[in-house]
């Protein structure tokens, strides 16, 4: 009887060991959530701020029983993000494009519908971003995205270089002012750069349409006028930039730049000589929103992440870090958030949400037709390549001059050497 009992005990011991090992492996299995966002667009734990991604990982362990690792990377333009997603070269679970790009990606089946039952914090999204008020066409049922931040484009200028009584302060004209040649920064993406020129050209009919969303054979002449403006601007532009603008404007190495209101507040915190206005002619309004790509491997977890980002404490942390306008009513009503923003800039809430933000005409970008996108790429290429060709001509001329000079010196030395031989 002892031998069968011993076998039974050994059997139970082995089974128990296997079960414990299996449980341990399950608890230790890491699920990687791939998130693709704009640069400087989340509270990351720097300088004492909340590390939102680390908080989500802790939330997953404690509330969902999952061992999650957030793999977080950034992009600098909608177009670069789109190129990566559409090529299939990388699989992300959460992406945060802008309104017009969301519309394009929906049309191309690059996004999957969201399950709002997994995103209960969606209830805190302001009604201005839902239903018929949705920030891009073709999604009045709010199927494909949840708004993250929104805002408007304005002009940032350094008051130690640009005087407040300057004639062009308040107008897009400041971006073309030759008094600041070599000190002006322009967007390094086609929609925003052409947008500055189209808004500067104005809304002739007074119907609120600046022609920014229609590019076809019929409307091409209007865009060619914008191209002429951008070509004219090249003589005063220091460079075409995106995230590089932060260091340039903070350090004072540039005087004027078109950029987003939230980023102005961030720059102002480090350089209080910077000022800002929304151009009187009109400007772009935009919404960046959280989406799940069609090829996401962890779609359900991605929606938990989106819901987490809409939780009040997390959304407040992100809003206090980025200084962008939040679409969540819970954030705007938060007293700590209001106090934080007033410490950054006395007019911060007005710039983001108040009369200043409502004082000029605005129009949001919508997706261009395939024909329009092709035309835009050609126009942008013409603008940028002309610069490259110009640089190439100068470099080529320089090389030729150096070569001719070297040839002349060589011939002179050769003559002297032969002259010595015959002396």
Predicted regions and their residues:
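C-terminal motif of bacterial Sec signal peptides marking the signal peptidase cleavage site
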Residues: 21-22
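Conserved C-terminal helix/tail region of periplasmic/extracytoplasmic solute-binding proteins
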Residues: 353-423
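Periplasmic-binding protein-like
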Residues: 226-231, 270-294
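Mature extracytoplasmic/periplasmic domains
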Residues: 288, 293-360
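Early extracytoplasmic/lumenal segment of secretory-pathway proteins
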Residues: 26-108, 391
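A ligand-binding cleft/hinge motif common to bilobed small-molecule-binding domains
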Residues: 101-104, 256-273
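Paired acidic/hydrophobic, glycine-rich loop segments that form the ligand-binding mouth/hinge
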Residues: 92-97, 238-239, 255-260, 275-276
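Extracytoplasmic ligand-binding site segments that recognize negatively charged/polar headgroups
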Residues: 36-50, 98-250
């Amino acid at each position: 009887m002892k031998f069968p009992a011993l076998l039974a005990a050994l059997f139970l011991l082995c089974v128990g060991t296997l079960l414990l090992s299996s449980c341990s492996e399950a608890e230790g299995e890491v699920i990687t959530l791939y998130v693709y966002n704009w640069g400087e667009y989340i509270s990351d734990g720097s300088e004492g701020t909340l590390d939102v991604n680390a908080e989500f990982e802790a939330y997953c362990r404690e509330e969902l029983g999952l061992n999650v690792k957030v793999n977080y990377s950034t992009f600098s333009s909608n177009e670069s993000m789109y190129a990566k997603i559409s090529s299939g070269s990388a699989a992300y679970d959460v992406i945060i494009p802008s309104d017009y790009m969301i519309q394009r990606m929906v049309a191309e089946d690059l996004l999957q519908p969201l399950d709002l039952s997994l995103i209960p914090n969606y209830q805190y999204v302001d009604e201005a971003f839902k239903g018929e008020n949705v920030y891009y066409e073709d999604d009045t049922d709010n199927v494909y995205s949840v708004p993250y931040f929104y805002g408007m484009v304005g002009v940032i200028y350094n008051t130690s270089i640009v005087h407040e009584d300057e004639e062009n302060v308040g107008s897009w004209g400041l971006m073309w002012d030759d008094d600041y040649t070599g000190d002006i920064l322009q967007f390094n993406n086609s929609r925003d750069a052409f947008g500055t020129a189209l808004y500067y050209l104005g809304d002739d009919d007074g119907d609120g349409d600046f022609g920014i969303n229609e590019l076809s054979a019929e409307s091409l002449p209007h865009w060619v006028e914008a191209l002429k403006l951008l070509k004219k601007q090249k003589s005063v532009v220091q460079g075409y930039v995106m995230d590089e603008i932060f260091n340039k404007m903070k350090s004072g190495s540039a005087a004027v730049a078109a950029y987003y209101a939230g980023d102005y507040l961030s720059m102002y915190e480090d350089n209080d000589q910077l000022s800002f206005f929304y151009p009187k002619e009109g400007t772009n309004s935009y919404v960046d929103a959280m989406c799940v790509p069609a090829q996401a491997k962890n779609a359900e977890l991605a929606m938990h992440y989106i819901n987490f980002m809409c939780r009040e404490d997390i959304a407040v942390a992100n809003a206090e870090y980025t200084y962008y306008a939040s679409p969540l009513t819970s954030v705007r009503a938060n007293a700590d958030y209001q106090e934080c923003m007033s410490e950054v800039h006395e007019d911060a809430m007005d710039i983001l949400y108040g009369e200043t933000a409502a004082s000029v005409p605005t129009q949001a970008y919508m997706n261009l037709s395939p024909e329009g996108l092709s035309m835009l790429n050609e126009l942008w290429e013409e603008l940028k390549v002309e610069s490259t060709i110009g640089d190439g001509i100068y470099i080529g001329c320089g090389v030729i001059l150096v070569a001719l000079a070297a040839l002349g010196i060589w011939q002179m030395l050769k003559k002297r050497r032969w002259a010595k031989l015959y002396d």
